[in-house]
Amino acid sequence: MKLHTLRPAKGSVKTSKRIGRGTGSGRGGTSTKGHKGAKSRSGYSSKIGFEGGQMPLQRRLPKFGFKPLNKIEFKPINLDELLELIEKTGASVIDTALMNQNGLIGKNDKVKVLARGEVKSIKAEIIAHAFSASASEAITNAGGKVTLIG
């Protein structure tokens, strides 16, 4: 095999359509664009969503939804998770930094403590952005302290 005998595989290379090269080529005249209309002109591009004068889909469908700009999203943490954290670390103060170090929350998450799980005694101060009423009651009844972050 020599370099000058190399050929591409059969069927792998197609010859391009040579349009607009006279009527004898079979692709002359209108150059495969049909007769008249905007689509046959140079520089044509349709508007996105234009349906030829029919009412476009984005205008036929109703508007929906609303996203409040000042909504605060809390990461829920339950009492049973906090009890596990207290057992694991033995800390007397549970704050967002400790929760972050142990993978319960992300760095910038706001925390709301919820009341899932039974609490017999908590000898710790729990610092969070929000507490459910039942969670704060359960913590204070079990001997713990609840502190809100502003």
UniProtKB/Swiss-Prot annotation:
GO CC terms: cytosolic large ribosomal subunit
InterPro entries, A to Z: Ribosomal_uL15, Ribosomal_uL15/eL18, Ribosomal_uL15/eL18_sf, Ribosomal_uL15_bac-type
Source taxon at top rank: Bacteria
GO-annotated biological processes: translation
Region annotation (Disordered) ranges: 1-51
Entry-linked Pfam families: Ribosomal_L27A
GO molecular function, one term: rRNA binding
Ribosomal protein listed as a keyword: yes
Family, as annotated: Belongs to the universal ribosomal protein uL15 family.
Assembly behavior: Part of the 50S ribosomal subunit.
Cited function: Binds to the 23S rRNA.
UniProt protein name: Large ribosomal subunit protein uL15
Organism: Cytophaga hutchinsonii (strain ATCC 33406 / DSM 1761 / CIP 103989 / NBRC 15051 / NCIMB 9469 / D465)
